Amino acid sequence: MDSKIQPTLRPGSSCPRPEWPEQERAEQLARGAALKWASGIFYRPEQLTRLGQYRSREIQRNYSLEARIKSVVQSYLEGVQTGVWQLTRALEAVQGTREALSQAHHLLKGLSRTSQTLEPLRECVVQHKQLQILTRLLPRLQAVPATVAHTQTLIDSERLLEAYVSLRELEQLKEETLAPLGGLELPIFQGLGLLAEALGQAVEAAAGAAGRLAREDPALLVAAIRVAEVETERTILGQAPRDWRQRCLRALQEGLERVHFASPVLPEPGALAGWLEALQVALPAELATAEALVAPCCPPSYRVVELWAHTLHSGLRRSVQQLLAGPELGAADTFALLHWALHVYTGKEMMGNLELGPEADVSQLEPLLTSENIEQLEAAFVAQVQVSVAQWLKKALDGEVAEWSGEQEPPTDPSGFYHSPMPAIVLQILAENIQVTNLISDSLHRRAHNMAVSELGAFLRSFSDALIRFSRDHLRGDAVAPHYVPYLLSAFNHQSALRSSVSVLLPDGEASGVLAPVEAALDDVQRRICRLVLEVLQVELQPLFSALPSRRWLLSSELLDGVCEQTSHFCQDFWRVRKPGVQLLLAEAERTVVLQYLRALMQGRLVCRGTDERSQAAERLRQDAAQLKELFLGLGLEESAHCAPVLLALRELLNLHDPTLLGLEVAGLRQQFPDVSEDHVSALLDLRGDVSREHRQAALSSLQAGPPPSPSTGRRALFSLVPTPTPSLSSCLPSGPCS
């Protein structure tokens, strides 16, 4: 073999072309190195002597490499030879195994045919064993139908523990037959499932009547609970576990709800309060029964009091929600439900009773009424109360208005003031509806306050409209009121009484600005009544003032005496008006008289023909001012409220002897009465009868050029309410309104 693996190439011989690129590259590198070395030798002749040594060294190295290659190839060949030998041995072993398996296969086929012939015998053996077991259990199996019937009888007679023991024995006998029979159930055991269900229903029924049984037959309740607990912890072969504990708890809840909330709560209008009162008594009694009687019959894990409280709460909440989903409740029912749910139910009388203990706490559960429910109920309650209040106020107003056209004077109180129960009725209606909402919540209280303010404002507007209709019908003659003015004065007292008591409508802690609409409505009613009263006075005085000013007026006080007499007679009933209303009426009456006086002066009926007449006119103005002052002081008007002194200011204008000083006097008049106009001044100058065009122009110019009136005067308008006749062309000035 060594001769076969000897290399056929010698050093320096040409090599065949390599088959791999790596080999070719290595050969190129080797040739390059050899050429490099040879070129170095040739360039250095002294090295040529060593060429023989190099050749012998290279030959030795080649021989060494060839020897190493031979050794490696030899080891590879020996390994291959060993592997071939092992493969041969393995092939022989596989062939032997194959032959053994073939023989075993033939043997198994024979055994299968043999086992098939023995199968009937095996079945006979199994049947023999089953018959042997059934023979041993035959007496017990024969008693199964009778035991089933007896167990059913025990269930029907509510002997639950005995029935459960009998059922357990039957189920145990069934388990003993299942394994030997290979899981086959005998027909006689097919009724056990129905029997167990009947017992479960009996347990459930007993739990559902726990409250009654705890009082009448606690032994039955205890038996039912014990059966449920034992059965829950037992496992039955081939069946799902019977969770009778959950059935029992569910029955406890359903029975409790059935007692108190079986039918939907749809009480008749007004009957809701009775239903709530019945629950107020029944629910605490039910919790007391649960704590004293039911809880000792149940395991502690049942937490009977907590279960009772939560069940009653959920049932009650569901009933309340059903009630709210039905027809809209009336105001009384809405109030009863809100008060009961927010205060009574959670109060000490019911669920907040300290004797119930923490297990009965329902504060962490969903409330009976959500915030949305409360909002809707409060809004509905206020809307219904508002309708009712509006109706009652309308009835009160209609009753009052019906008396205005009567033959009798308005009634008076012991002090002699005109009096009517209407203001007290109005405020009582509003105050009672506000006060009752304090029992519910602050939000409802605020709603009621706002409703009351709104309704009082509407009532005052209706009251004002009724006064207008009353006055219109009287003045037109459609329905003449015998006591027109007294009833107007009585109405004045009504608004005064309402104004003095309207503060009861102001919520606690609220600013008085909340009542601003009501106060504005009261002011409007007051102004309207004053206007209606003074219109009558104005009509009565108008014929008297038609003769003023005149020569007769200059010479005698007879005209003003008639005015004072008529005014005094008209104001004689003012004392029946309560203060400060009487002062307001007297002040307005005096103002009306003064305005009528000024209107008469401005009509140009009189022109003084000399100094004597001007002096007489000035003196008459002084006397008239004093007479009017005396009249109204006698009637009770405070002096600070008088406006008759305007006549004294006009007197100074008439009493002035030097016409050149009229400008100063007119400027002073404007300082006192900023609303005086050129027409008014011209009418007064016409009354003097001695003012030339130049003096008139100077006086009117001073009216425009004078200093602005002092803002501290605080006087009400007088002259702006006094009309003046259209001046003639001869009296028009370029600076006047006719220019």
Swiss-Prot record:
Alphabetized Gene3D superfamilies for the sequence: 1.10.357.50, Exocyst complex component Sec6, C-terminal domain
GO cellular component: exocyst; secretory granule; transport vesicle
Pfam families: Sec6 (PF06046)
Record text on subunit structure and interactions: Interacts with EXOC2, EXOC4 and EXOC5; may be part of the exocyst.
Top-level taxon: Eukaryota
Keywords of the record: Cytoplasmic vesicle, Exocytosis
Annotated InterPro entries: EXOC3/Sec6, EXOC3/Sec6_C
Protein name: Exocyst complex component 3-like protein
Region (Disordered): 1-21, 698-718
Protein encoded by which gene: Exoc3l1
Protein source organism: Mus musculus
Main localization, broad class: cytoplasm
Any one biological process term the GO annotation gives: exocytosis
Tissue: Ubiquitously expressed.
Similarity annotation: Belongs to the SEC6 family.
Residue numbers spanned by region Mediates interaction with EXOC2, EXOC4 and EXOC5: 1-370
